[in-house]
């Protein structure tokens, strides 16, 4: 019975997160920073190249040093081209992975199923995360949780 409840929590977290954020697959590039990060950045649009990788580790184009973000965007463009829909979905999947990881870690640390599920659901669905899920260039918070 307990295993069924845990699987049910994972399922509900997955379905609710996808239900809320699935619409981003139809979003376009944002007018704020996406041009610097993707749509007008030839290093990113070229995909993963040696020059691009070197650039990712040596640039502070936007005032930040975040090579993992650049490499991730390059990989996205390598796989999907300059199409924002799949890149948005990658952000959703990263957010979902973070949500499930949070639930697993909290459950392991506390042994409490329902409080862990509640915190993970609040993390997954809180409006504060809309920006970091729906905006292409905000991969930093998605990757930061893994460390």
State where each predicted segment sits.
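Polytopic membrane enzymes that build or remodel cell-surface glycoconjugates and lipids
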Residues: 1-147
């Amino acid at each position: 019975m307990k295993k069924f409840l845990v699987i049910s929590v994972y399922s509900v977290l997955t379905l609710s997160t996808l239900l809320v954020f699935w619409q981003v697959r139809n979003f376009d590039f944002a007018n704020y920073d996406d041009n610097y990060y993707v749509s007008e950045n030839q290093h990113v649009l070229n995909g993963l190249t040696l020059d691009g990788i070197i650039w990712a580790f040596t640039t502070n184009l936007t005032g930040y040093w975040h090579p993992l973000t650049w490499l991730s965007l390059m990989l996205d463009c390598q796989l999907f081209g300059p199409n924002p829909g799949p890149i948005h979905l990658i952000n959703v999947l990263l957010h979902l992975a973070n949500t499930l990881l949070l639930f697993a870690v909290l459950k392991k640390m506390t042994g409490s199923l329902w409080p862990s599920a509640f915190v993970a659901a609040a993390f997954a669905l809180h409006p504060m995360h809309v920006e970091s899920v729906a905006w292409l260039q905000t991969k930093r918070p998605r990757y930061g949780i893994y460390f």
